[in-house]
């Protein structure tokens, strides 16, 4: 998995960033394990082994949630988004529109594209800089 490795030299990163990276990689690994155990359980025809695999999957879910909570406690951005989107039954895109004041469906609409053929993301060139 590409995210296991640091993308910048470790000596340039704060301990906070390195610890967050460890937590994010751990979360990815736990979620991947959930998927693997579920697939194994689905494919398993022996009831006893099936039950063990489901038990193991549920343990991985617990580990993932513990890690996610650690991340939430240390990241105001994660905390804010989790408070917006989790533990509600309202439509997710409705929550997003309310939170950001914009609608994703409008942004994806073909009629909202600029008429000049641009993707609407602006120039990537820096002002005053020639190639």
From Swiss-Prot:
Alphabetical list of InterPro entries matching this protein: EncFtn-like, Ferrit_encaps, Ferritin-like_SF
Keywords carried by this UniProt record: Encapsulin nanocompartment, Ion transport, Iron, Iron storage, Iron transport, Metal-binding, Oxidoreductase, Transport
Enzyme class: oxidoreductase
Enzyme Commission number(s) of this protein: 1.16.3.1
Coiled coil: none
GO cellular component: encapsulin nanocompartment
Regulation: The ferroxidase activity is inhibited by zinc.
Record GO biological process: intracellular iron ion homeostasis; iron ion transport
Family assignment from sequence similarity: Belongs to the ferritin-like superfamily. EncFtn family.
Domain characteristics, as noted in the entry: The decamer has negatively charged patches on its exterior, and a negatively charged tunnel at the center, the charges are probably metal-binding sites.
Record's protein name: Encapsulated ferritin-like protein
Organism ancestry: Bacteria, Pseudomonadati, Myxococcota, Polyangia, Haliangiales
Annotated gene: fer
């Amino acid at each position: 998995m590409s995210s296991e490795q640091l993308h910048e030299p470790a000596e340039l990163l704060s301990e906070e960033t390195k610890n967050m990276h460890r937590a994010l990689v751990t979360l990815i690994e736990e979620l991947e394990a959930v998927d693997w155990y579920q697939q194994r359980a689905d494919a398993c025809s022996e009831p006893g082994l099936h039950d063990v695999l489901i038990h193991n999957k549920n343990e991985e879910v617990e580990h993932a949630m513990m890690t996610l909570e650690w991340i939430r406690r240390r990241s105001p951005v994660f905390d804010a988004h989790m408070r917006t989107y989790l533990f509600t039954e309202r439509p997710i895109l409705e929550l997003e529109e309310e939170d950001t004041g914009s609608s994703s469906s409008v942004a994806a609409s073909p009629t909202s594209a600029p008429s000049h053929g641009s993707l609407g993301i602006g120039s990537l060139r820096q002002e005053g800089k020639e190639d």
